[in-house]
Curated annotation (Swiss-Prot):
The entry's keywords: Host membrane, Membrane, Repeat, Secreted, Virulence
One cellular component (GO) term of this entry: host cell membrane
Name of the protein in question: Secreted effector protein PipB2
UniProt domain comment: Contains various tandem pentapeptide repeats in the C-terminal region. The pentapeptide motif is required to efficiently recruit kinesin-1. No position is completely conserved in these repeats, whose consensus sequence is A-[DN]-[FLM]-X-X. The C-terminal 38 amino acid residues are required for peripheral localization of PipB2 and redistribution of lysosomal-associated membrane protein (LAMP). The N-terminal 225 amino acid residues are sufficient for type III translocation and association with Sifs and SCVs, but not accumulation in peripheral vesicles.
Major location category of this protein: secreted
Spans through the membrane: none
Amino acid sequence: MQRSLDSLAGMATSAFGAGTSAAMRQATSPKTILQHIINFFTCGGIRRRNETQYQELIETMAETLKSSMSDRGAPLPENIILDDVDGCRVEFNLPGENNEAGQVIVRVSKGDNSETREIPLASFEKICRALLFRCEFSLPQDSVILTAQGGMNLKGAVLTGANLTAENLCDADLSGADLEGAILFMADCDGANFKGANLSGASLGDSNLTNACLEDSIMCGATLDRANLTGANLQHTSLLGCSMVECNCSGANMDHANVSGSTLIRADMSGATLKGATIMAAIMEGAVLTRANLQKASFTATNLDGADLSEANLRNTSFKDCTLTDLRTEDATMSTSTQTLFNVFYSENI
């Protein structure tokens, strides 16, 4: 029995003190030599049983929090009790009048026997909020609650049309998620992973996407006005028809992205890489592309009036039927054909 209590206490500590994939694997792996032997001859039976218990513990916690709190932003109860978890009582005592330790005290008991652990309050609260987030948006609970960086694990989540205004999604894993039409206005997505996600028609105005990964994502018709995409990864991203007015893409990797039909008026793309990017019928008036790498990028019928391409890499860059009035190209590196095109344009407009 004692080993059972110890195992459950360890699971509770891992799930609600860390919540990561590594913590889940450590908590559900066989511990003793006998368990390893049984696990081997049952083709992972011990691990599967532990994983089932781990998942049930998380689901019980989520339901308990949901029923005891008025909304996701409400203060957590000082005492959270999970009754009958595999015949045991699991209690979480938060810092307060009855707990001056500053940590969350976890107590697993059955009859006269008990096991006690401590977990950091900040981690516990973050994990509880993540569980409540899933409840609010009707997402099934996952045994991996947080990423290794401490963001929410929302991999493959269906959040179409969800209102995520000003949501904290820092370091969240939203790879493969469906966020079509979602509202992420002023959301903090610093370091978030949106690889392969569907963000078509999403509202991302004034959002923070610094160092976010948007590789291979679909963002057709999305609004990114004044969004901060500094250092973001937008390789092979479909940005067709996006509104990116005054968007900050400085230092972003936009190699092979398709920006056709987008509005990038006064966008800051300084130091960005757009190698092999497709830019057709885009509006880029006043865009800043200083020191940008535009090697082999293709500009067709694009308005570059007043854009700044000084010090940019324009080797083998194609400009066809583009508006180039007041374009700045000081110290830009370009192939002979591109230089000839600019010389002809400037001579015709003297």
